[in-house]
């Protein structure tokens, strides 16, 4: 019966993806927070978003108006080359699984969201879908104050909420005054409260760095202060309702605490493996053998200095792409929002990965799918410029903050 249901779902999804690619993309993006393993205990774990991503591949091959990965392609291939060289010398039982996982995010997700949309409208449902899921998870988290929400650990939920917060803030920035903007303001308040209650400091750091990236690109600090008038009181109220023990746990950095101690132990384990081969590391798959809560040290341990350099190049290539493209579009352009969200998500995920698991399902799918959206926007800007369309905006108009919070 289970196989019949799975087959029926796959067939229906294929039909939807071929007919409405925007809906298929939304089903990938907005279900990413649900990291629950659907493998049934198999050797390879996968979530509903990963299933949807793979089911959309036929639509990518048959219906995509273009097939691009963007400027990150060469750094990604370089990174995979270093990973292959390291793994050839230090093969592990989980090496293939890790390669598949990395390819799924860095190649398939990026290519899917960069290639399949016909226009920016095909991505709107994805963004609003994630905001809706974020509001749902935040409400449950705030009401129950449980360490698990719908079978998801609070750290995973916190990572997803930080992504939803970034998307909601950028959509609020870009929105026209009216009911839609008021709803986004309410969503921001709810998601912000849920993020706080999650007590995930990695998610807090990721959200902070993501928001800082948005501000650096938009340079609309006055408008952000108006948004803070809504967010800060709600966050303070949520904080006062937290139990004293939870507040102490969230603000404590004593090395004697088990969670802080575990982070230091993780770094020491990674350091030992890195010292065995500083150039190429000890092989991909090591992340499955210890509690890898620092992406920099994990990358050094698995692929050495060459791997860390290649991973840094991937992020630099994406940020350079966004910086180049955003100078050619106005801040009210939908393409600007896609560029800003892509950069903010990747920076957020990297910051989070410095203090927690980077390659965990959920937020990483959202981050690199957003990178694909930014790549789509980049190619759209190039197309407009090549066709002589006016994509610029008067500088004073672009920097003029909104007159009202709502």
Language-model features: locations:
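N-terminal hydrophobic segments of proteins, predominantly signal-anchor/transmembrane helices
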Residues: 16-100, 104-107, 135-140, 180, ...
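A membrane-periplasm/extracellular boundary helix in multi-pass inner-membrane enzymes
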Residues: 193-199, 215-258, 266-276, 405
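Long extracytoplasmic/lumenal interhelical loops at the membrane interface
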Residues: 148, 245, 253-306, 324-329
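Membrane-interface helix caps and helix-loop-helix hairpins in membrane proteins
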Residues: 40-42, 88-97, 144-152, 196-197, ...
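Short, aromatic-rich membrane-interface segments at the entry and exit
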Residues: 2-6, 21-28, 42-50, 95-100, ...
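Membrane-embedded alpha-helical segments of multi-pass membrane proteins
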Residues: 2-9, 34-35, 45-62, 100-109, ...
């Amino acid at each position: 019966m289970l196989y019949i249901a799975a087959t029926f779902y796959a067939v229906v999804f294929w039909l939807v993806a071929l007919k409405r690619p925007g809906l298929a993309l939304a089903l990938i993006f907005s279900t990413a927070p649900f990291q629950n393993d659907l493998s049934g205990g198999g050797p390879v774990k996968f979530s509903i978003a990963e299933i949807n991503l793979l089911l959309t591949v036929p639509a990518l091959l048959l219906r995509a108006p273009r097939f691009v990965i963007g400027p990150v392609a060469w750094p990604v291939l370089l990174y995979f080359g270093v990973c292959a060289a390291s793994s050839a010398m230090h093969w592990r039982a989980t090496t293939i699984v890790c390669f598949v996982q990395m390819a799924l995010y860095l190649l398939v997700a990026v290519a899917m969201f960069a290639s399949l949309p016909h226009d920016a409208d095909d991505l709107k449902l994805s963004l609003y879908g994630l905001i809706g899921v974020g509001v749902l998870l935040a409400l449950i988290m705030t009401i129950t104050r449980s360490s698990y929400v719908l079978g998801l650990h609070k750290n995973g939920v916190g990572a997803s909420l930080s992504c939803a917060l970034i998307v909601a803030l950028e959509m609020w920035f870009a929105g026209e005054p009216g009911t839609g903007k008021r709803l986004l303001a309410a969503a921001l308040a709810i998601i912000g409260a849920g993020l706080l209650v999650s007590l995930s400091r990695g998610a807090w750091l990721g959200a902070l760095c993501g928001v800082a990236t948005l501000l650096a690109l938009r340079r609309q600090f006055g408008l952000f202060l108006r948004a803070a008038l809504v967010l800060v009181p709600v966050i303070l109220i949520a904080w006062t309702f937290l139990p004293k023990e939870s507040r102490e746990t969230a603000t404590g950095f004593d090395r004697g605490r088990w969670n802080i101690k575990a982070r230091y132990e993780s770094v020491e384990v990674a350091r030992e493996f890195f010292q065995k081969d500083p150039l190429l590391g000890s092989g991909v798959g090591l992340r499955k053998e210890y509690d890898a809560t620092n992406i920099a040290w994990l990358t050094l341990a698995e692929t050495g200095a060459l791997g860390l350099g290649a991973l840094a190049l991937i992020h630099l290539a994406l940020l350079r792409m966004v910086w180049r493209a955003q100078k050619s579009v106005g801040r009210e352009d939908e393409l600007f929002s896609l560029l800003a969200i892509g950069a903010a998500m990747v920076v957020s995920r990297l910051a989070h990965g410095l203090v927690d698991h980077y390659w965990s399902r959920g937020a990483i799918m959202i981050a690199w799918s957003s990178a694909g959206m930014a790549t789509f926007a980049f190619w759209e800007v190039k197309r407009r410029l090549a066709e002589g369309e006016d994509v610029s905006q008067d500088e004073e108009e672009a920097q003029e903050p909104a007159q009202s919070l709502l």
